[in-house]
């Protein structure tokens, strides 16, 4: 039988199937079921900086003194952070696989201290999402990319656990950014995060939400950029996210240069049983191709081997 073990961000995974951050990973009970279903690692549901600020705005009084507003924001933040740290601790008790915490932030101020608390709570790694649409006409070129580097650099000075950067696809030069992320201590990069999709209802003549799920067509973006990045910045680990809707997608991602894949939409649309299906398919494919371990074919079809 082939060996499906892989290393991602310095973590040893029994297989390359990582459960992406979502509502599927927001409780220890759910995470235990994913672990029992065969997942290689779990990324906990993200804690969103903007959600904390929005909740504080919703509960606040516009006529409140600044001191009162600051207290409310601080109270809500501490409450949410406390809940999240408990999620880490409880999940670690029931899951004997890597548990990766996740934060979604657009500034680095208070998240640096929180990263330290995440490590103390027992998280095996931290995934950082800096997903934002830049719509300010005055926003300087390159500022968004520099924000990634600044936040990563500050977090790396605070924690010893691996820091994983999950990127959006709205970057001008992903390879240049990835090279700088590696230089500043990133252990791995996930490609790509996914924006909520907009739509328009022509009967109501109103904006509406698009599909919340990815499709298999989304995988091509990850294959392209992981194929390029894994050749250009080869010492980093990569994971493909978005579009893994069939077990063949796992093989494709590894051939492109990924060490692992993150899945979410396929679990929502099917069941936890697909984890075992993906693992079985990968094992059968490797045996059919005479592959004894994942390193034998990882990156076999990245750009360096196609030129």
PLM features: what roles do these ranges have?
Residues 64-70, 74, 219, 227, ...:
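Extended, intrinsically disordered, low-complexity segments
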Residues 251, 256-292, 296:
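Shared catalytic-loop signature of beta/alpha-barrel
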Residues 12-18, 71-74, 162-163:
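Short, basic, glycine/proline-bearing loop/turn elements
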Residues 24, 108, 267-268:
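Short strand->helix junction
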Residues 14, 25-30:
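Short N-terminal binding/cap micro-motifs at the start of the first secondary-structure element
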């Amino acid at each position: 039988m082939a060996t499906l073990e892989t290393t991602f961000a310095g973590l040893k995974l029994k297989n390359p199937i990582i459960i992406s951050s979502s509502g599927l990973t927001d409780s220890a009970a759910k995470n235990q079921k994913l672990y029992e279903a065969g997942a290689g690692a779990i990324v906990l549901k993200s804690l969103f900086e903007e959600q904390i600020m929005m909740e504080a705005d919703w509960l606040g009084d516009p006529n409140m003194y600044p001191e009162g507003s600051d207290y409310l924001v601080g109270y809500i933040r501490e409450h949410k952070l406390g809940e999240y740290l408990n999620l880490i601790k409880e999940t670690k008790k029931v899951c004997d696989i890597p548990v990766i915490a996740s934060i979604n932030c657009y500034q680095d101020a208070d998240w640096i201290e929180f990263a330290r608390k995440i490590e103390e709570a027992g998280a095996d790694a931290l995934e950082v999402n800096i997903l934002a649409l830049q719509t300010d006409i005055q926003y300087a070129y390159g500022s968004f990319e520099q924000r990634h580097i600044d936040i990563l650099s500050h977090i790396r000075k605070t924690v010893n656990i691996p820091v994983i950067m999950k990127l959006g696809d709205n970057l001008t030069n992903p390879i240049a950014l990835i090279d700088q992320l590696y230089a500043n201590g990133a252990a791995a990069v996930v490609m790509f995060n996914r924006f909520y999709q907009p739509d328009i209802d022509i009967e109501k003549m109103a904006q509406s939400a698009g599909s919340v799920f990815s499709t298999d067509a989304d995988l091509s973006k990850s294959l392209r950029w992981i194929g390029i990045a894994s050749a250009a910045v080869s010492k980093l680990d990569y994971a493909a996210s978005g579009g893994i809707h069939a077990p063949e997608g796992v093989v494709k991602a590894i051939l492109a240069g990924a060490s692992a894949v993150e899945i979410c939409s396929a679990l929502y649309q099917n069941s936890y049983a697909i984890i075992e299906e993906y693992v079985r398919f990968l094992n059968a494919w490797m045996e059919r191709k005479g592959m004894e371990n994942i390193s034998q074919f990882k990156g076999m079809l990245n750009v360096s081997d196609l030129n």
